[in-house]
């Protein structure tokens, strides 16, 4: 069993984070796996202090403890100096970067977190995984079964999955667009196609007008560029 705990939330202290992670570790027992995600909220000094304390819970890895690739690289060096052996995973530093390869060039991470939708699809992620050469964790945003199925397809296509995928976010939605949603059973997801059901989803008139205006603006701008 694997659990991810969000840390470094604006309203929380390090003591709060330690208490939550300890509770999760106790619930999973010594054989469960615990990972934490700071979403880039710490500076290097904060991250070093926090990870030194969190390390006693036998973390699988710390995801995006700092915002920039340079900070992640500095943090890994400083963790090694003080003898703290905790993996660093890069998420935002890959999917929001113009050059994801800098994570490897600067030795900024031990693990790559790949999300299909923001990275441009399954094939793009497979190419990126090969390019990075790091152990991969396939993860998702808060998506319907249609999006989760793409993540499952990526996971199935990778030669190795050393860590559990982070694809159980469908439970955070109140409903799904698929008649036969992907549901985790015994810690696993089926590899299969998922199609939206027959239920219609209609935007409000206000939202529809906003998007139509946005489309017209974009098309007008594209036409001006093409006419130069």
What are these regions (language model features)?
Residues 5-149, 175-177, 182-184:
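Catalytic core of soluble alpha/beta enzymes
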